[in-house]
């Protein structure tokens, strides 16, 4: 909901910047909260990764609004959510699949209440295509988070690898989807950013093998 409000207030570009930069929060938590040690090779991978974020987001924003309250909430929200997912993955009292099911049930209830509010208060009409798209995105999101938690469980001692790998993967797949599905125009710097994201994943993977 906050992300949608941010897009409405300041545009998708500034919101996307805030979401991508939220990677800084879980990486910091990996070091101070989860006591992970970073090798020099992994640090280089992080630097290349943040460079990839900069170049892929090197786009003009159509919004002239400078209200950074919502983008800041997006940055903090996504960063904290990543940390919580890591906690859920290694939580021993419940299996992570049970925790994930409860999380999605809670999110579903909140979404239904929000939808009912929009129908009753704002008199918006509920269209079948919106329901179908919502279900499709929900299923994809569930699968995405499920494998995200599995990765955290498999690499419990190296959460930064999962955090960074996920973020770089989103950059690559998001860029490909934009080009192939939505015919989005990318600059040479955007393509360079995608290349850096691939290089970052390779470097971080190599750091795991050493």
Predicted regions and their residues:
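Membrane-interface interhelical linkers
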Residues: 1-9, 59-70, 104-156, 179, ...
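Structural signature of hydrophobic alpha-helical transmembrane segments
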Residues: 34-50, 71-72, 96-109, 157-170
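Hydrophobic/small/kink-forming positions within alpha-helical transmembrane segments
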Residues: 1, 23-28, 79, 138, ...
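C-terminal transmembrane-helix exit sites in multi-pass transporters
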Residues: 24-43, 170-191
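Structural motif at transmembrane-helix junctions in multi-pass transporters
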Residues: 3-18, 90-98, 148-166
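Hydrophobic transmembrane alpha-helices of multi-pass small-molecule transport proteins
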Residues: 29-31, 41-58, 189-208
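Glycine-/small-residue-enriched transmembrane alpha-helix faces in small-molecule transporters
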Residues: 62-94, 109, 210
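Juxtamembrane helix-loop-helix junctions in multi-pass membrane proteins
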Residues: 83-106, 126-130, 157-158
């Amino acid at each position: 909901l906050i992300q949608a409000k941010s897009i409405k207030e300041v545009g998708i570009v500034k919101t996307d910047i805030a979401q991508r930069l939220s990677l800084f929060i879980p990486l910091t938590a990996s070091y101070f909260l989860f006591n992970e040690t970073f090798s020099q090779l992994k640090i280089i991978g992080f630097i290349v990764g943040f460079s990839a974020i900069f170049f892929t987001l090197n786009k003009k924003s159509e919004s002239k609004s400078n209200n950074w309250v919502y983008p800041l909430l997006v940055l903090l929200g996504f960063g904290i959510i990543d940390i919580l997912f890591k906690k859920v993955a290694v939580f021993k009292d419940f299996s992570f699949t049970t925790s994930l099911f409860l999380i999605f049930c809670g999110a579903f209830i909140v979404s239904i209440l929000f939808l009912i509010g929009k129908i009753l208060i704002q008199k918006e009409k509920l269209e079948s295509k919106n329901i179908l798209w919502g279900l499709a995105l929900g299923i994809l999101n569930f699968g995405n988070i499920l494998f995200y938690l599995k990765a955290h469980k498999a690499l419990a001692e190296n959460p930064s690898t999962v955090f960074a790998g996920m973020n770089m993967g989103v950059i690559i797949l998001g860029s490909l989807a934009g080009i192939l599905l939505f015919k989005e125009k990318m600059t040479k710097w955007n393509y360079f950013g995608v290349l850096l994201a691939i290089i970052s994943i390779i470097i971080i993977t190599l750091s795991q093998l050493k």
